[in-house]
Amino acid sequence: MSPIDALFLSAESREHPLHVGALQLFEPPAGAGRGFVRETYQAMLQCREIAPLFRKRPTSLHGALINLGWSTDADVDLGYHARRSALPAPGRVRELLELTSRLHSNLLDRHRPLWETHVIEGLRDGRFAIYSKMHHALVDGVSGLTLMRQPMTTDPIEGKLRTAWSPATQHTAIKRRRGRLQQLGGMLGSVAGLAPSTLRLARSALIEQQLTLPFGAPHTMLNVAVGGARRCAAQSWPLDRVKAVKDAAGVSLNDVVLAMCAGALREYLDDNDALPDTPLVAMVPVSLRTDRDSVGGNMVGAVLCNLATHLDDPADRLNAIHASMRGNKNVLSQLPRAQALAVSLLLLSPAALNTLPGLAKATPPPFNVCISNVPGAREPLYFNGARMVGNYPMSLVLDGQALNITLTSTADSLDFGVVGCRRSVPHVQRVLSHLETSLKELERAVGL
């Protein structure tokens, strides 16, 4: 087991579940009978060939961190890991998200491989859902979403049902992209070998370009210690609406997404009499790949974006966000790989402090919220003939970072998954209505 995987396992507690998940929503095929979901679930249980990743469980000697390792289960109880649930009446999306929130709050059983899949029926409109989760020691959020898409096909009538745990879904090796904390851990090891001059250059890049720096974020109700219970919210927006704002304003799609989130967070905090005078700061993962990079390589960094929540005008906020992201990405893309790595380390290393008990209260937040836009499928996807109409990432929250917003694309929509600490972030579902309001304000601001 790698030191980073061991860190995820050792840092987990009842208050800090460290798994990532996704809620996928499906529309049964035309003519599907009342038993379609049950039959689909039974067919999933017949997929008894299980990939090695789904057989791994942690083991330790006398509880010592340095002796943590992986064991391989020869006999995986699929009836335990793959479960079927039914929603109570009236079967609204509200009931679905309440169940998802409870499932996302529960720790995975360390005596078994660290994953679960829940097939959920009972939605009154006939749709069904699949909620899946895996421990962050096995996958990060991006590779987890990729893995959960593996059973999908672009052909609605393809006959053979596949599952995420089936070896057949592993024909393309999943290159694990580092998540926020895994990326930090990897950078800690890599940057140790950098020459001092490289670090000085990276530090100069931050100061001379006047980039957004850690610890410049205001302390808010989102930056407190968290409990173990989670509240999940999810909603989709037409991709065309966001693209129309992008084209009219001459900015990137991610700039518009960040502006949507900025407006929503501004209203949410204002509703709670907690809007600070200084702007919120978001941690935003970005791709640093250039045309010169090989296909197999990864170049992923992170920047801190000024969300301009102190500005009343949505157009001004969008312009400020565009300028902040452009400046940050330009500096990182022009640096050699080692220096870009060092800059990302300087930006993210303070976040590691908040993983230690009590320090979330004692230190200013390095940033206020993580907002991640994960590339998704460009074509409609199907599972056993059922079209996937929503794919909502469910990430993790940490002490000092009580809210997470992650989104991905599904064909012609953007699917937002919002996860908050149930105790620290009340009525997290209101963030969704504020996102819609924020998008409408942006549309008006650019003349749409």
From Swiss-Prot:
Keywords linked to the UniProt accession: Acyltransferase, Glycerol metabolism, Lipid biosynthesis, Lipid metabolism, Transferase
Reactions the enzyme catalyzes: an acyl-CoA + a 1,2-diacyl-sn-glycerol = a triacyl-sn-glycerol + CoA; di-(9Z)-octadecenoylglycerol + (9Z)-octadecenoyl-CoA = 1,2,3-tri-(9Z-octadecenoyl)-glycerol + CoA; hexadecan-1-ol + hexadecanoyl-CoA = hexadecanyl hexadecanoate + CoA
Pathway of action: Glycerolipid metabolism; triacylglycerol biosynthesis
Residues forming the catalytic site: H136
Highest taxon listed in the record's lineage: Bacteria
NCBIfam families, per database record: acyl_WS_DGAT
General function of this protein: Upon expression in E.coli has a weak triacylglycerol synthase function, making triacylglycerol (TG) from diolein and long-chain fatty acyl-CoA. Also functions weakly as a wax synthase, as it incorporates palmityl alcohol into wax esters in the presence of palmitoyl-CoA.
Gene Ontology cellular component terms for the protein in this record: plasma membrane
More about this protein: Was identified as a high-confidence drug target.
Listed EC numbers: 2.3.1.20
InterPro entries per the UniProt record, alphabetical: Acyl_transf_WS/DGAT, O-acyltransferase_WSD1-like, O-acyltransferase_WSD1_C, O-acyltransferase_WSD1_N
Protein name per its UniProtKB record: Putative diacyglycerol O-acyltransferase Rv3740c
Family in the record: Belongs to the long-chain O-acyltransferase family.
A single BP term in Gene Ontology: biological process involved in interaction with host
